């Protein structure tokens, strides 16, 4: 089962997101700020597959901090950034830092939860394929070194 | 040199008198009384007095007396002045500006009797630097031929020294007026009170019959009457000049003062809005009120034409310089007030920007959560679940909507926080009311109140300021551990026209890194509420032209310090 960490400083937001992704069969965990998120990311075993984090919590750079912590722990952990109104520029910054994607919390007429689930599924697939690729490469490298022997 | 002046005794008298004149004693009456007594005694005279010119009535009023025979009616004697003979030696001296000495008053054509025992009399004028008579020193003796040339010369020196001191006093008065007015810079007083203050200060330093202030309207197309003492006072905000129209309009357009003793003879004169009937005007100064970028208005001072030809009442160059200086300072004050207003506007706009961004963020988050609940509700309903499964979702939706409403209501409060309806109020009463309102009755938290007596009233919106204090009391109380304390104090501010209010507690205090943020909208370390409290408190204090700071030590308690300006003094409270 894929494990997802939901980071947001609003109880109601965490509850709603968690409920929705659990419905899809994912295992969800919560953190209410960046420092709690960093602790959980560093101690999780195995690492989280996907981290869904709010962009702005204690500071404007909260989302970026969580992102850095996640990829430092496991390069293949995918991070999806949630942005409230007016933070798209920051979200784009996160994309440059290696986030999988960003989801705007408020898009009129759109069920953003369905969109989020879709993004999580895509992120999970990419993680799976990244890990698969890495394992294959690993095997090839091993076989080459065995041939050399 | 004659015998009298050359003697050591004579020099000692000069020394005594000049010491009196240069003394730091500010009470002119004390000094004049002492000089008169010394002069009388040293001249061997029996009686002496000084009469000062009353410019308005063209009379001499006995002001200082010495020697025998003075009683209540005598000391209030007013001497009509005329150049005709038989109308009094004092009046004659005032008119001619020359000394007069007689060895036998009964042979003197000017003499009129106020005391039966007078035989010799000597009177010399006290003239200002423009040669205008300000008063007359009069010395009398019951002996014939009591005074010689040397006495006359001596008395002339005394009169000149007195004139110097009178002039110095006038200058000191003007300096004091300028200094006192200078203090207004940055005080941000209400304009009406400010203009009244200018008129009062000018009237203390220059005797005049009327004074008016015209200020340009917003689009700078007309000079509108904003303040006036006399008749013209009935036409405040009605009487106006176009730029360049009349002497007043010319002054505004050219940025230069005008001083004239006969406005009607001036080709620029139009006589549109006059404080006095045109034929009664004896002197006029119109000075431009100059701001940083342009002329803001005109300060106009008028004196009534004297009915007595000998009483000069045109304004002097010094008068013009003083009025011009006052007008310039008024310009600086109006400019500075405008600047502060603009700065506050900029700050307010910045606060607004932040408020809007943060509100949008918070509303966005709530709406996102509500949409999550709706999404789940739809799912639950599609699954055909029982009502019980829906209840938590409906509750959550209700909470979400409630929080949205909370944001809206705080937002509205932020908007109205700075719309004030002010009047002078007692700060102690406000603080007491707020404490009564916000501090719970049954609690083990101790309340300490220290209210300083005799604080000046503040110009405040009582309802808003009370709310602001209540918020701080409530804030302090909420952070108190058991048996903690909340201390509320009022005291004089850092300047005489400020008051300080302090709210201290023994709670956890504010961490250094949060001190800058606590007044920002939606900043809160409390789980309940949204943190708009302190930003509204700051908004209200700012709107009162006050300041608020948190000066507590983290770990020891919070300390909120508010400094508010006292209400501008009105003319009435000045008189009181």
Predicted regions and their residues:
Chain A
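The short loop immediately C-terminal to the conserved phospho-acceptor aspartate in CheY-like receiver
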Residues: 56-58, 78
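Short, conserved "switch-loop" micro-motifs in signal-transduction and mechanochemical regulators
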Residues: 73, 85-86, 97
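Receiver (REC) domain switch/output surface
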Residues: 112-130, 137
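Short amphipathic alpha-helix used as the core "switch/output" element in two-component signaling
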Residues: 39, 61-76, 93
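Two-component/phosphorelay signaling modules centered on CheY-like receiver
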Residues: 11-30
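Acidic, metal-coordinating helix/loop segments flanking the phosphotransfer/catalytic sites
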Residues: 19, 30-50, 58
């Amino acid at each position: 089962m894929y494990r997802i960490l939901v980071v947001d400083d609003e109880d109601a937001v965490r509850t709603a997101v968690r409920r929705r992704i659990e419905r899809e069969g994912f295992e969800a965990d919560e953190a209410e700020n960046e420092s709690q998120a960093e602790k959980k990311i560093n101690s999780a075993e195995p690492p989280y597959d996907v981290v869904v984090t709010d962009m702005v919590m204690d500071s404007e750079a909260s989302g970026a901090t969580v992102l850095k912590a996640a990829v430092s722990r496991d390069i293949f952990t995918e991070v999806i950034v949630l942005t409230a109104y007016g933070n798209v520029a920051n979200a784009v910054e996160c994309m440059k830092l290696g986030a999988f994607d960003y989801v705007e919390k408020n898009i009129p007429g759109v069920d953003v939860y369905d969109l989020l689930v879709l993004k999580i599924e895509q992120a999970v697939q990419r993680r799976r394929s990244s890990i698969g690729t890495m394992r294959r490469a690993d095997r090839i490298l091993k076989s080459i070194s065995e041939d050399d022997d | 040199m004659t015998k009298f002046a050359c003697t050591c005794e004579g020099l000692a008298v000069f020394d005594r008198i000049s010491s009196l004149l240069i003394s730091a004693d500010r009470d002119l009456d004390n000094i004049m009384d002492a000089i008169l007594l010394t002069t009388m005694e040293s001249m061997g005279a029996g009686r002496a007095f000084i009469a000062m010119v009353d410019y308005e009535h063209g009379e001499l009023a006995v002001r200082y007396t010495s020697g025998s025979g003075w009683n209540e009616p005598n000391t209030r004697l007013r001497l009509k002045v005329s150049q005709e003979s038989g109308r009094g030696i004092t009046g004659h001296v005032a008119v001619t500006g020359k000394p007069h000495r007689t060895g036998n008053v009964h042979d003197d054509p000017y003499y009129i009797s106020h005391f039966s025992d007078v035989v010799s009399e000597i009177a010399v004028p006290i003239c200002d630097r423009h040669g205008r008579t300000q008063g007359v020193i009069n010395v009398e003796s019951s002996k014939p031929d009591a005074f010689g040339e040397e006495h006359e010369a001596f008395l002339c020196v005394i009169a000149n020294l007195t004139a110097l001191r009178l002039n110095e006093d006038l200058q000191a008065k003007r300096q004091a007026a300028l200094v006192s007015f200078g203090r207004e810079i940055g005080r941000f007083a209400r304009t009406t009170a400010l203009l009244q203050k200018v008129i009062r200060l000018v009237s203390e330093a220059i005797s005049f019959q009327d004074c008016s202030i015209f200020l340009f309207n917003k689009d700078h197309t007309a000079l509108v009457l904003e303040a006036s003492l006399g008749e013209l006072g009935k036409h405040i905000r009605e009487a106006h000049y176009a730029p360049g129209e009349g002497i007043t309009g010319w002054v505004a357009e050219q940025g230069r003062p005008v001083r004239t003793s006969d406005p009607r003879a001036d080709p620029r004169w139009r006589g549109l809005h006059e404080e006095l009937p045109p034929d009664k005007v004896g002197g006029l100064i119109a000075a431009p009120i100059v701001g940083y970028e342009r002329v803001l208005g005109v300060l106009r001072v008028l004196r009534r034409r004297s009915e007595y030809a000998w009483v000069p009442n045109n304004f002097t160059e010094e008068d013009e310089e003083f009025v011009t200086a006052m007008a310039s300072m008024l310009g600086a004050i109006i400019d500075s007030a405008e600047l502060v207003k603009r700065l506050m506007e900029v700050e307010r706009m910045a606060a607004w920007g932040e408020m809007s961004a943060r509100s949008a963020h918070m509303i966005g988050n709530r709406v996102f959560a509500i949409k999550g609940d709706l999404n789940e509700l739809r799912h639950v309903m599609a699954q055909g679940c029982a009502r019980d499964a829906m209840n938590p979702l409906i509750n959550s939706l209700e909470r979400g909507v409630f929080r949205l409403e909370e944001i809206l209501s705080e937002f509205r409060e932020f908007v109205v926080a700075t719309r004030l309806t002010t009047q002078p109020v007692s700060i102690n009463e406000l603080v007491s009311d707020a404490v009564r309102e916000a501090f719970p009755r049954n609690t083990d938290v101790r309340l300490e109140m220290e209210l300083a007596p005799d604080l000046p009233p503040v110009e405040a919106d009582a309802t808003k300021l009370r709310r602001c204090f209540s918020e701080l009391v409530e804030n302090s109380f909420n952070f108190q551990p058991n048996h903690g304390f909340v201390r509320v104090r009022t005291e004089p501010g850092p300047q005489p026209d400020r008051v300080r209010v302090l709210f201290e507690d023994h709670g956890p205090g504010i961490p250094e890194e949060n001190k800058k943020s606590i007044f920002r909208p939606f900043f809160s370390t409390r789980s309940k509420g949204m943190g708009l409290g302190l930003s509204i408190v700051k908004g209200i204090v700012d709107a009162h032209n006050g300041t608020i700071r948190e000066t507590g030590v983290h770990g020891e308690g919070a300390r909120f310090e508010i400094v508010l300006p006292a209400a501008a003094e009105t003319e009435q409270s000045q008189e009181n």
